[in-house]
Amino acid sequence: MKRLQALMAEQGPDIYPEVIAALKDDPREGAQRLVRQCQTYLKERERQRAVLQRMYNYERQLWSMGYRHIAGIDEVGRGPLAGPVVAAAVILPGEVELPGIEEAKRLSDRRRMELYRRIREVAVAVGVGLVQPEGIDEASVVVATYKAMMKAVADLPVTPDYLLIDGVHLPNVSQPQVPVVGGETLSCSIAAAAVVAKVVRDEYMVEMDAKYPAYGFAHHKGYGTPEHRLALERYGPCPIHRKPSDGTPAGAVLLFTEG
């Protein structure tokens, strides 16, 4: 059994079926535990592959039509009280494996960062666009979202020939596009963009936490948590806080509505 364990460490999951075949009739508890571990791993890998197969349906259809540089686009940061709207655009080279991508918005910070590095490693191109609070205040969060997405597309070092966008139709772009409602669960390209946008925005808010430490931005990333609302009541808004649609500073509105 030690020899098999050494082979597993050396060759990885590809040898798991051989391990299962060699040990399935071995009555020792250690052998059966190893069999169960291999079976569990292989079952989960097959599940992830099936999910990936489904999540490449949009891309696969477009590749078959001759499109090569398909950009998935998503954004994060529409709902916070502070910080920018961030959008990302990602062009993948084909049906690359991105373990955990189907849970892009529910991953732990550590797993999301691992996936982010993997996306950066394999992507044909990655673009990012930010619209700061003053840009949101001047128009609306919807317009800011469009602007961030268009910036992300413009930031791509490779020009996309088709856009897959999470839930919206992007105005004033030359490429053909399709809005995909719930896109981060239906398209790997969109899900990859969601991961990139989330990591970029979170890192930005950690930087802002160092600049404005009273608000706890590193913890809540600008969202309206009790901690954040309490800090707003105590200190008022800082330069990266957004204004409500009537132009009143965020802190003043909170003091009035929660007073």
UniProtKB/Swiss-Prot annotation:
A divalent metal cation binds at D74, E75, D166. Belongs to the RNase HII family. It is an enzyme of class 3 (hydrolase). GO terms for biological process: DNA replication, removal of RNA primer; mismatch repair. Signal peptide: none annotated. Manganese or magnesium. Binds 1 divalent metal ion per monomer in the absence of substrate. May bind a second metal ion after substrate binding. The keyword Ribosomal protein does not apply. Its main location: cytoplasm. Residues 68-257 form the RNase H type-2 domain. This is Ribonuclease HII 1. Its cofactor is Mn(2+); Mg(2+). Keywords: Cytoplasm, Endonuclease, Hydrolase, Manganese, Metal-binding, Nuclease. Endonuclease that specifically degrades the RNA of RNA-DNA hybrids. Pfam families: RNase_HII. It comes from the Bacteria. GO terms for molecular function: manganese ion binding; RNA binding; RNA-DNA hybrid ribonuclease activity. One of its GO terms (cellular component) is cytoplasm. Its EC number is 3.1.26.4. It catalyses: Endonucleolytic cleavage to 5'-phosphomonoester. It is found in: Cytoplasm.
